[in-house]
């Protein structure tokens, strides 16, 4: 992405995927109660809170669109991740996708996916064990996720010649 700031951040996706956006909002509200905060800190926390509300509104719009198109599975996924943490692999991938793209939208294009294997594996493993997901279905979901992450990379000259901000750590 030619206009983004090179920042190479690796957000704590694991916490938000596991606990949800409402938990993040509660965390911010608790920090806002600290009487020793200065004005800059108050503005920062309020901005973070407003960003989460905006993400939730975006998810709500996608949920309504899914319902209009009779995509009930997608609508249910979106309804859940709008407030709660992910309950399965599909929801975890969807919330990660929205969080990742929301950070992009803020102009931070080098936000890596970090230790994807560590925070996604528990959802994958649990779904396999309880029979709600097959390895083939998981592969399809992962394939779609990574294709979407790089959907527009061919639009930018030289994009695949170096770090494109889509770093993934495995191991």
Region locations from a protein language model:
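Catalytic cofactor-binding cores of redox enzymes
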Residues: 1-171
